[in-house]
Amino acid sequence: MRNTDTPIAVEGYPFIAGFAAATLLLALLGQFLHCGFFVPATLFFVLTVFTVFFFRNPERATPGDENTVVAPADGEVIFLGKVIEPHTNGEFEKISIFMSVFNVHVNRAPISGKVVDGFYTKGKFFDVRDERASFENEQQGLVLETAAGLRMVVVQVAGLIARRIVCYAKTGDSLSRGRRYGLIRFGSRLDIYLPLGTSIDVVMGQKTVAGETVLGILP
């Protein structure tokens, strides 16, 4: 996979460069033409700062051993329960995490394992807090298999605002627990499907930190 360790996610560079260039241009026009460019220049400066903040890519310290499942996303737990995962048609323990525009949007591998399958589904753009988003929204999923042979599914779900999913991983890749593997732009949701028997360690409404918050222990 590509290098994903830059302090600002590389997907943010074009946005940052564009807003910064607009800020500089408007400031220069205001200086030399003595026109009212202060307000738009300030607006683009604020957009530049927010975009840097949005695409921040901090280091994380991953706890536990290889049976410890860590959160793949920063955000808030909005669903817990047993469900049938539609791609594999298997029954899993599902945890859904909602990412607001203020969360870090870089996604991390919840376990160490091999990507044995990947899928992309076009779809709608419901608000990701609506449970229909898990089944009907645009999404990118990975099926991971651990060294012990356990399988789980992690799905990036696009939302009402977030309509650009980035996934660096592909079938055949090996992921390390806590390693960055993708992101979703501007507010989104991530669904993780864990094997039955996993001991779940989070509750509804709990805040999560990608790569650090323990979601559960594999059976």
Swiss-Prot record:
Any matching Pfam family: PS_Dcarbxylase
Pathway the protein acts in: Phospholipid metabolism; phosphatidylethanolamine biosynthesis; phosphatidylethanolamine from CDP-diacylglycerol: step 2/2
Localization (cell): Cell membrane
Post-translational modification as stated in the protein's UniProt record: Is synthesized initially as an inactive proenzyme. Formation of the active enzyme involves a self-maturation process in which the active site pyruvoyl group is generated from an internal serine residue via an autocatalytic post-translational modification. Two non-identical subunits are generated from the proenzyme in this reaction, and the pyruvate is formed at the N-terminus of the alpha chain, which is derived from the carboxyl end of the proenzyme.
Ranges in a coiled coil: none
GO biological process terms held by the UniProt record: phosphatidylethanolamine biosynthetic process
Keywords: Cell membrane, Decarboxylase, Lipid biosynthesis, Lipid metabolism, Lyase, Membrane, Phospholipid biosynthesis, Phospholipid metabolism, Pyruvate, Zymogen
Enzymatic class: lyase
Cofactor: pyruvate
Cofactor note: Binds 1 pyruvoyl group covalently per subunit.
Reactions the enzyme catalyzes: a 1,2-diacyl-sn-glycero-3-phospho-L-serine + H(+) = a 1,2-diacyl-sn-glycero-3-phosphoethanolamine + CO2
GO CC aspect terms: plasma membrane
Membrane topology: Peripheral membrane protein
Sites of Pyruvic acid (Ser) modification: S188
Alphabetical list of InterPro entries matching this protein: PS_Dcarbxylase, PSD-A
Active site, UniProt feature: S188 (schiff-base intermediate with substrate)
Quaternary structure and interacting proteins, as annotated: Heterodimer of a large membrane-associated beta subunit and a small pyruvoyl-containing alpha subunit.
Function: Catalyzes the formation of phosphatidylethanolamine (PtdEtn) from phosphatidylserine (PtdSer).
The name this protein goes by in its record: Phosphatidylserine decarboxylase proenzyme
Species annotation: Citrifermentans bemidjiense (strain ATCC BAA-1014 / DSM 16622 / JCM 12645 / Bem) (Geobacter bemidjiensis)
